[in-house]
Design a protein with these regions (language model features):
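Glycine-rich oxoanion-binding loops at beta->alpha junctions
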Residues: 2, 48-101, 108-109, 141-148, ...
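Phosphate-binding loop/pocket of nucleotide- and phosphate-handling active sites
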Residues: 243, 287-324
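N-terminal phosphate-binding or glycine-rich loops at protein starts, especially the Walker A/P-loop
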Residues: 2-49
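Flexible, glycine/charged-enriched surface loops at secondary-structure junctions
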Residues: 36-42, 160-167, 219-223, 246-252, ...
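Accessory alpha-helical/coil subdomains and C-terminal extensions
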Residues: 103-105, 115, 122, 143-246
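Short, acidic/small-residue loops that bind anionic groups at enzyme active sites
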Residues: 39-41, 117-142, 194-198, 251
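Short Gly/Thr/Asp-enriched flexible loops that form oxyanion-binding sites at enzyme active sites
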Residues: 22-27, 108-121, 181
Length: 324
C-alpha cells in the first residue's frame, strides 16, 4: 500500500539557479490544490539538520516567479554526507510530520534524496543546475537563463573587442561540463571554444587561428572558455606575447547564476514542480523529474545517477566548422 502523503517539504540544495523560485511556487500551490500542507526547509540539507523549517502558504510564494535565486536559500552540508547526519535528517522529517521531500538541485542533491528515501522519507528530485550536466534530462532549471545571460555579456564584449581590434577570452561557468561554453560559442559566433570535455586543446592552433584571421582582415577574435579549462588571464598574456594582438580576459563568474529567469525556465520549472507534487501524491519515491524528447518524465534516482552524459559531438563539430 502506498504511503499517504499529508505534508510535503521542499528544499533547494547546491548552487542556486534561476527558476528555482518558480519551482518552489509550483510545489506550494500544487500541494495546496491537492489538500496537502507544505513546509519550506531553509538552506538545503544544512537547514534540515538545524530544523530551519517553516510552514508555507500560497501567499508566501506570491511575486517570486520572476525572481532569481531561491527564497529558501541554499548551502552545502558535509554533515549530511555521513550516515549519522542522514539518520538525523530522517528523524527530523518525522518529528515535523514531513512525509515526503522535494529536492531541487544537482547530482549531489539527488544522492542526498536517495539516502532519505532509503530511510523511509519519500523523495522526488528536480534538476536545478545552470550546468545542464544531469544525464537523465535534456533540460535543467536555470540553464536557459544562465546561457542567455552569458550570451548577452559576450555580445557586449564583442562590441568593444571589435572597436579596439582585440582578442577577447570570455570565461563562463562549467567546471566539469562545457554546455554553457558550447552554446554560447555557437550563439555568439566565437572563433574558438574551450571545453573541459575536450581538455587536450592546442593553444598553438588558437594562435595560428588568430594570425590567419588577422590576415583575412578580421577585427576581433572571441574565445569562449569554460571554467574547467580556466587560466584565462595567463592564457591572454601568452596569446598577446605570441601574436602581438592585444588580448584581454573577462571572467563572467556568478552573474550567470543570477537574474530574472527566462520564460522557458519559469514554465519548465513550474511544470516540474507541479509534477513532483503529483508523483508524491501517487505514493512514488526515489524519483527524479526530467525532460526528454519533448515530454516531462521521471526516473528512478539510482538509474538516473548511473546515466552518463557527454557533449553532443555533432554540435561540437559544427561549432568548429562555423568558427571561421
Amino acid at each position: 500500500m502506498a504511503k499517504e502523503i499529508n505534508t510535503i517539504g521542499v528544499l533547494t540544495s547546491g548552487g542556486d539557479a534561476p527558476g528555482m523560485n518558480a519551482a518552489i511556487r509550483a510545489v506550494v500551490r500544487e500541494a495546496i490544490a491537492k489538500g496537502k500542507k507544505v513546509k519550506g526547509i531553509k538552506r538545503g540539507y544544512a537547514g534540515l539538520l538545524q530544523e530551519e523549517i517553516v510552514d508555507m502558504e500560497a501567499k508566501d510564494v506570491s511575486d517570486i516567479i520572476q525572481r532569481g535565486g531561491t527564497i529558501l536559500q541554499t548551502a552545502r552540508c558535509m554533515e549530511f554526507k555521513t550516515p549519522e547526519g542522514q539518520q538525523k535528517a530522517a528523524e527530523i522529517c518525522k518529528k515535523h510530520g514531513i512525509d515526503g521531500i522535494i529536492v531541487i538541485g544537482g547530482d549531489g542533491s539527488f544522492r542526498g534524496a536517495q539516502k532519505l528515501a532509503a530511510l523511509g522519507i519519500n523523495t522526488i528530485g528536480l534538476p536545478g543546475t545552470i550546468d545542464l550536466d544531469i544525464a537523465c534530462t535534456e533540460y535543467t532549471i536555470g540553464f536557459d537563463t544562465a546561457v542567455n545571460t552569458a550570451m548577452e555579456a559576450i555580445d557586449k564584449v564583442r562590441d568593444t573587442s571589435t572597436s579596439h581590434e582585440r582578442c577577447s577570452i570570455i570565461e563562463v561557468m562549467g567546471r566539469g561540463a562545457g554546455y554553457i561554453a558550447l552554446w554560447c560559442g555557437i550563439a555568439n559566433g566565437a572563433e574558438d571554444i574551450l571545453l573541459p570535455e575536450k581538455y587536450d586543446y592546442d593553444e598553438q592552433k588558437i594562435v595560428n587561428h588568430i594570425i590567419e584571421n588577422r590576415k583575412r582582415g578580421k577585427q576581433h577574435h572571441i574565445i569562449v572558455n569554460a571554467e574547467g579549462i580556466g587560466h584565462s588571464a595567463s592564457m591572454a598574456k601568452r596569446i598577446e606575447a605570441t601574436t602581438g594582438v592585444e588580448t584581454r580576459a573577462t571572467i563572467l563568474g556568478h552573474m550567470q547564476r543570477g537574474g530574472s529567469p527566462t520564460c522557458k525556465d519559469r514554465v519548465y520549472a513550474s511544470t516540474m514542480g507541479a509534477l513532483a507534487v503529483d508523483l508524491l501524491c501517487e505514493g512514488k519515491s526515489n524519483r527524479v523529474v526530467g525532460y526528454r524528447h519533448g515530454d516531462f518524465v521521471d526516473d528512478d534516482i539510482d538509474e538516473a545517477l548511473a546515466m552518463q552524459k557527454s557533449i553532443p559531438e555533432y554540435q561540437y563539430q559544427i561549432s568548429k566548422n562555423l568558427s571561421m
